[in-house]
Every structure is written in C-alpha cells, then in structure tokens.
Design a protein with these regions (language model features):
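Core dinuclear metal-dependent hydrolase active-site scaffold
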Residues: 1-50, 131-195, 321-327, 333, ...
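Generic long, charged, amphipathic alpha-helical segments
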Residues: 384-415
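Hard-cation-handling environments
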Residues: 228-371, 384, 419, 434-436, ...
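A general structural motif
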Residues: 186, 219-224, 310-321, 340-342, ...
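Active-site neighborhood of phospho(di)ester-bond hydrolases with catalytic His/Asp-centered motifs
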Residues: 28-30, 52-61, 68, 80-83, ...
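Metallo-beta-lactamase
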Residues: 97-161, 291-329
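Pre-active-site segment of Zn-dependent metallo-hydrolases
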Residues: 9-14, 21-134, 186-195, 378-386, ...
Length: 578
C-alpha cells in the first residue's frame, strides 16, 4: 500500500497525490501549478496516465483540478468522483482555462512564425476538457462508495468553497486496513459563505493543508469592519476607481455579499460595481442554485428578501468591448479575475488604473510567489504588463480575513479532533515556512508529523488502536523500499557537530534518499528560476522587436535582433525540456 506525493509538497499549487492499493492506482486531485512553478505544468506526469484507475477530486479550484484534461489527453479513462457543485464549477473553470491557453498559444505561435519557429501548443484543447467532463461521477456528501477493489471513500464538507470536500479513504489490502484522510483545502471554522468543515476523528494518516500554517486571520467581525471602514472612505471621496482582483469562485461572491451589506446601511448606493468575469457570472448562478449548501448567514439573508450576490448596482460584463468601456468610467468598483493578477481581465484594468494615485487596489486573497499580484503586494514600484513598464501609484490594500482557507489556529483545532486515534500527519499544500511551522506545532501537541516532499513515496501500514505509526512500522514486515514514515520524517541530527566518520556511520538509507530528492528539487527550482529570468528578458525585448518590425531600428541591427530571438527561444526550449 503506497502513497506518492506528486505535487503541492512545500508549495501551494499543483495538488496531486497517488495512492496504490491492490495493484490499482487512485489519484487525489490533479491541479495546475501557478506562480513561479507554472512551468511544471508542461512536465510529464510521474506515472502513466492510462495506468490510473480512478480520480478523487476535492474541489474545483484550478490548482486542484486544472491538469485533469491533460491527464485525459494522455490516456486516463477512469471515473472522476466529485460532488455535483464541484463538477459544475470545474466544467466552467476548464472551459475558461482552454480559452486562456488557446489565446496564449495563438499569440506565441504568431510571434514564432515571424521568426521561422514552430507553433506553440496549448497544454490541452477543448476536446480534451469535453472528454474529461464525460468521466465525472457525482457523489453525495457523507455517502460511502467503493471506487476500486478494497478501497471505499466518503466525501465530507470541507467548508472551503461550494462543493469542496475532505475525503476519507478506507483501504484494505491482504486483510490489512488503513484509514487515510485528505483534508483538501479546509475552510475556516467560523465561516461566512460556507458551512463549517465536517468533523472527522478516525484516521491512521492525515494529509493536512498548510497554506496559512504559520499565520492567523482576523476574525469575521474585524475583517468586515476593516473592509467597511475602507470602503466608506472611498465612497465619500467619489473620485476613485477601486480594483479588486478576485478569485471568481467564492471570493467574488463573498465580496458582492459584503457590498450588499454596505448598501443595506445606505452606504455606497449608486456607486457602480462592474463584475467583469463571464466565468464568475456563471459561477454566481451556481452558488444561487445550491444555496442549501451555503452558511446559515447567507441562507438567512436570502430568506429575508436580500440578494447576497447582486443588486441593481452590480453590472455583469460579458464582452471585451464592455470590459474596455469600463476604463472610461471615472469611479466605480471593478471585480475581475484572476485573483493573483497572472491573467484574466484584471490585468488590462490594472494597466489602465494602477498608475493613478487616486485609485485603490484591494487584494482580498492569497498571492503566490512569482505572480504579478505578489509583486504588487510586496511593494513593487513598477510592473510590466504586455511588455510595458507601468508605475505603481495607486493605493495598495490587503485584507487577509476574507480567506477561504483555515488559518493556523483553525488547522490545529481541526487536527485536535483526531486526538482519539492519534494519526500521523503529513503536511502538504503550503510553502516551506508555513508547512514546517505547522508540522512543528503538531509535534508539540503530541502528534507524529512531517512535511511531505515532492516525489516522495511512503508505505502505509495499519496499526492497533492507540499505537503510533512508528511503532507499527517496527512490527511491519513490509519491504524497506519505498521509504517508511520513520525514514521519511526522521529528524535532523540535533547536535550538528558529528565528525565525518560519525556521519558516515550513522547516515541511514532513507536520509540518503531524502538528500537526493532535496538535491533534485533544488535543481528543478534553479532551472525554473532560470527559465523565468529568460522569459523576463524575452518580454523586455518584445518592445525592441516590435520597433524593428515597424522600421524604427536600422537595417544593420535587424540580423542581430533576429539572432537574439532565435537564441532566446532555443535556450528556453532546452531549459523547459530539462
């Protein structure tokens, strides 16, 4: 019985876990990488797509579902188990991803054609997404179903977004039973939009997310007060544009609800709200159709005659022409994706407004390393959009309490529910600092816990009630490879002062394998940084190439520019291949 971490290990995106039981392979999530790791989307899967028998999807967000069409393109034909809202949202998100990737590939192919280079292929096309949709198998919360011989699962409400799930897996192999819980993305214990995460107490292993494993959020009341105070000041000025980059699933609906509460107090009435996301409009309709799965607060607001996700002041934007026309508005609120500003319509809105000191940019969600949003939040004085350098003069605000992720306190509270069975925690879905911090806190509470590493494989063993996993492994007759939990999570030498001879004598096979994995991981990251730097150089040279094509550069310089273009593309191609 094996578990392999194929993504979201010491990083927030790219969730992908492989479970092998009785010779059958089951994937949990298959998400896209975003930010500085997005080049990994092009890399081959660490398993044959046609060898996977089934997929369990925790929720629709693209960092959990975005590579499923690629998996289907490469041969996956098993069922994809998910809740109905997750299925409906994923279909919307995949269609939008196809559009964005096709547009990007078309732009890059046109550029390549001018240089005599081959066209660029998108990660997947519409036919791949459509084929993936046919594999969906809807499941109900709390119902136990068998997904392969000896493996049954139960989806539980995770309270993260509409339809999000934790997944309980009961795996039986050779009369040995192991209980594994995948947390997915956990919502806050006290949430505004969704129901609180379901309570689970029984497990041998728990994969726990750690997005905010080292941070606390403001509570709902403090967050609401902060947002309302800021918006009141902006409304009183009546001369500003407010740009809110937002995830168009769940976060956009939450912001529209908060604006509705303000209008109910007579604040901000008449100030237009431009919801510039056709995909977000579709998602909002799904939220309205599944109101019974949302929080008591939202349902109560609706029962009392309110519309939590819209009013006459909210204008839904569909076409590009309508989107561009918003730039002519002197004041108003613009809600648009993507939430990290690494694509979508928010990019052209920022290009047209971030240079104006009267305007405001309000970030209401997590900004991953390597994204435009992260650069702005970190204080960049200038940013580059479509090859143009733009000064950042608008006022920048960050309100963290809107997060649909559990914070450190909530994560530990959720983990404490497992105290009756004392499982081993495998920390995933967090940057290194956050993941390490959460693992340390779990160990302080008496749990066995370690941070998962990319491409790490562990063997899963059953245990007696109250027995630690490390004790169960001592008694297990399982083969020494792949590494056990005890090896994978072995602590570093606390003294740090052993002689070279002592180090040689005490190094264990698991530690050597772990060092090799770390070296490979650092090499991959260094390569991705190199690729990103080369892409930045290519982006900065785009203006020069455009000037050359329009005749603004001398004929003598043209051959040199062509040579540089070919060289850059060649280096980038080789770097991505590596």
């Amino acid at each position: 019985m094996l578990l392999k971490f194929c993504g979201a290990a010491r990083e927030v995106t790219g969730s992908n876990y492989l479970l092998e039981v009785n010779g059958h392979r089951i994937l949990v999530d298959c998400g896209m990488y975003q930010g500085e790791h997005e080049d990994a989307n092009e890399a081959p899967f660490p398993y044959a797509a046609n060898s996977v028998d089934a997929m369990l999807l925790t929720h629709a967000h693209i960092d959990h579902s975005g590579r499923i069409p690629k998996l289907v393109k490469e041969g996956f034909r098993g069922k994809i188990y998910a809740t109905l809202p997750t299925i409906e949202l994923a279909e919307i998100l995949w269609d939008d991803s196809v559009r964005l990737m096709s547009e990007d590939a078309e732009w890059r192919s046109a550029k390549n054609a001018r240089r005599g280079l081959p066209p660029t292929e998108p990660l997947y096309r519409q036919e791949d997404a459509d084929a993936a949709k046919k594999l969906f198998e809807p499941v109900n919360y709390d119902a136990r179903i068998e997904v392969s011989p000896g493996v049954s699962v139960r989806f539980r409400d995770a309270g993260h977004i509409l339809g999000s799930s934790m997944i309980e897996v009961l795996a039986s192999e050779e009369n040995k039973v192991v209980r594994i819980v995948f947390s997915g993305d956990l919502g806050p214990m006290n949430t505004v939009m969704e129901r609180s995460p379901a309570e689970i107490t029984d497990a041998d292993y728990v994969l726990i997310e750690s997005t905010y494993g080292n941070r606390e959020h403001k509570d709902n009341d403090a967050t609401r007060e902060e947002f309302q105070t800021l918006m009141k000041d902006i409304f009183n000025a009546k001369k500003a544009k407010v740009y809110i980059p937002t995830f168009v699933v769940d976060r956009a609906q939450r912001i529209m609800y908060e604006l509705a509460l303000l209008r109910g107090q007579g604040i901000g009435t008449g100030m237009p709200v431009f919801f510039d996301s056709p995909m977000g409009v579709k998602a909002t309709k799904l939220y309205e159709s599944h109101m019974d799965l949302l929080s008591n607060e939202i349902q109560s607001y609706r029962r009392n005659g309110g519309n939590p996700f819209g009013s006459e002041d909210v204008k839904c934007i569909s076409t590009r022409e309508e989107s561009q026309a918003v730039n002519a508005q002197k004041f108003g609120i613009v809600l648009a994706g993507s939430g990290m500003c690494n694509g979508g319509r928010i990019v052209h809105h920022l290009k047209n407004g971030i240079w104006n000191p009267d305007n405001h940019i309000i970030f209401v969600g997590y900004q991953a390393h390597g994204t435009l949003g992260r650069a702005i939040v970190d204080g960049a004085k200038t940013i580059r959009i479509a090859g143009e350098s733009i000064n950042v003069k608008a006022k920048i605000h960050t309100i963290g309490g809107f997060s649909a992720h559990a914070d450190r306190t909530d994560l530990l509270s959720w983990a404490d529910r497992f105290r009756p069975t004392m499982p081993h925690f495998l920390v995933v879905h967090g940057e290194s600092e956050a993941a390490d911090s959460l693992a340390s806190a779990l160990r302080t509470r008496g749990f066995e816990a370690c941070v998962a590493e990319r491409d790490q494989e562990i063997q899963l063993v059953p245990r007696e009630a109250g027995q630690k996993i490390s004790e169960a492994l001592e008694e297990s007759r399982a083969a020494p490879r792949p590494v056990s939990i005890a090896e994978a999570c072995a602590p570093a030498d606390p003294g740090g002062a052993a002689t070279e001879k002592e180090q040689t004598e005490t190094v264990q096979p698991g530690a050597l394998k772990r060092d090799e994995r770390n070296a490979e991981k650092h090499a991959r990251r260094a390569n991705r940084r190199a690729v990103r730097s080369l892409e930045n150089i290519a982006d900065q040279m785009r203006d020069i190439f455009e000037k050359a094509e329009s005749g603004e550069v001398s004929a003598e310089a043209q051959p040199l520019l062509d040579a540089v273009a070919v060289l850059l593309d060649s280096i980038l191609h080789r770097s991505r291949a590596d």
